[in-house]
Amino acid sequence: RQVLLALVSSFAFAGGHKGLDWDTALSGDHRSESNRGRDQYRHPRETLEFFGLSAEMTVLEVSPGGGWYTEVLAPLLKDHGQLVAGHGAPNGSAYGRRSLGGYLQKLGRAHDVYSAIDVRVMQPPAMPLGVEAGSVDMALVFRNVHSWLRAGTAEASLADIHRALKSGGTLGIVQHRGTDGMTVEQMKRTAYVPESKVIEMAEAAGFELDGKSEINANAKDTKDYPGGVWTLPPSFGAGDDNRAKYAAIGESDRM
């Protein structure tokens, strides 16, 4: 039985997150001031506690991008667990190469923090994650569902994750939250995906919804920007136009 946690909670499962060095993970010198400043929107500790993270787990971070969450996960898992980063292929697209290259450079700049990370190619269906089936305790997907929809790889990505997870393992998803009734094209264009759509896709892949909550909700997010979610911080896709307005809204409303 695999478990899907679709939303990030403001509370935690009792007993599931003992022995974690949150001070180092959140306040260590390996994190920039700007990245620490985003904690107010992303609530990393509350998020990971809700998902049930513990120090001895093998955790898969799917498509970690620039490594914002890697900064938090790596110190928490280094001594007793394992962090697997499922990133893009070195021989992929120009964007994929830049993303992977930047990620590896980040790991190299603070090797003492990141030395234990196992970086793997994960680009299903062509290049599925090369780990043993049933070897992962927890898989984490941070704001990547819209990218799957754009690439047409949602089904393959969820199947790859399902294969990697142990029986009873946990899939935790954070995603820009859209409104019911959106078309798939609207989801692709704006990066907002309805909660019901995410749950539907995960359940179709064999996952079972176990919990959801509102810790990363943002009622100020009107979700009606011509430039989609990238209009809001940190991207500020509209440049200086209405920048103060979008800064006051903050980062997106997230499931």
Where are these regions (language model features)?
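A short acidic, Gly/Pro-enriched loop at the edge of an enzyme's catalytic core
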Residues: 128-139
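A conserved beta-strand element that flanks and buttresses the S-adenosyl-L-methionine
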Residues: 140-144
